[in-house]
């Protein structure tokens, strides 16, 4: 998305263009990250480490599997005589086998959930008609207004553009950190997955496994909310600014930066709240 920066000869315009290019770079990076799987993220090196940790924790998970199973049998069966009943014994046996399968094939289960979420992201991208994020550029009207000001009038514009550029840079950083944080949550959940999945062995403890699966699904679906936020922002940013004649150049630029930063704040806020939105929709509290 980012091309070579061409200097306009005006420091104020160059500063705004540089800030917008930084913002566009981060949006482009987010667009790429949303279509990247954990296996391919950063060359796959992190994923290989996570897979190794997941395999190592399976030994602990199998021990917990037996513990959860025994505790579950003791709480659900009133006596040993009740356990001798064929239907009760069969039910406990099936639960243990399914819990063991969840621990053994937990990695396949989690990658399947992520693939479903990625399919939803690809569908949203296709339906939106966007192959990439629309770049935010400095409108010609604003550039003309800045170029027409004199030396004295340009002094307040310097302060306005410096403040606006700082806001844009900070918002860009917060936005990309949030998206990277989603990958870290995916990795951490995948690494410790065998332990919470082992809780399916006992009926009283199965709520732990259910909550874990729902939380992991919520992390995967955060990508859909982030993508929708970016698409909505692109529609906001595509509308041209309203330039009122007769206003001072500093006021015109300030109004433009204020509107731009407001739209960016809406996007960053939506991305930051993506986990909360998904949790509320899925009833996770």
Protein language model features and the residues they cover:
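Alpha-helical transmembrane segments and their helix-start/interface "positive-inside/aromatic belt" motifs
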Residues: 5-15, 86-106, 209-219, 274
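Hydrophobic transmembrane alpha-helix segments characteristic of membrane transport
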Residues: 64-100, 192-206
């Amino acid at each position: 998305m980012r091309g070579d920066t061409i200097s306009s000869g005006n420091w104020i315009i160059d500063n705004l263009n540089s800030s917008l290019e930084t913002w566009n770079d981060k949006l482009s990076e987010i667009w790429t990250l949303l279509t990247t799987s954990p296996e391919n993220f950063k060359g796959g090196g992190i994923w290989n480490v996570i897979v190794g940790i997941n395999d190592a924790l399976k030994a602990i998970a199998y021990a917990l599997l037996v513990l959860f199973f025994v505790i579950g049998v003791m709480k659900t069966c009133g006596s040993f005589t009740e356990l001798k009943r064929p239907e009760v014994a069969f039910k406990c046996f099936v639960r243990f086998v399914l819990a063991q399968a969840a621990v053994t094939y937990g990695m396949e289960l989690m990658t399947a959930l992520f693939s479903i979420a990625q399919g939803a992201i690809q569908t949203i991208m296709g339906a939106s008609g966007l192959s990439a994020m629309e770049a935010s550029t400095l409108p010609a009207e604003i550039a003309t207004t800045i170029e027409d000001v004199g030396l004295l009038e340009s002094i307040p514009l310097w302060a306005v553009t410096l403040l606006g550029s700082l806001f844009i840079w900070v918002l860009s950083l917060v936005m990309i950190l949030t998206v990277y944080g989603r990958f870290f949550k995916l990795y951490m959940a995948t690494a410790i997955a065998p332990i919470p999945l082992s809780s399916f062995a006992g009926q009283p403890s199965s709520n732990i496994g259910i909550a874990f699966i729902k939380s992991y699904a919520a992390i995967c679906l955060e990508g859909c909310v982030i993508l929708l936020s970016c698409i909505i922002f692109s529609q906001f940013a595509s509308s041209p600014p309203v330039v009122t004649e007769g206003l001072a150049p500093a006021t015109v630029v300030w109004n433009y930066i204020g509107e731009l930063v407001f739209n960016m704040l809406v996007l960053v806020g939506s991305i930051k709240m993506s986990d909360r939105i998904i949790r509320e929709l899925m009833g996770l509290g």
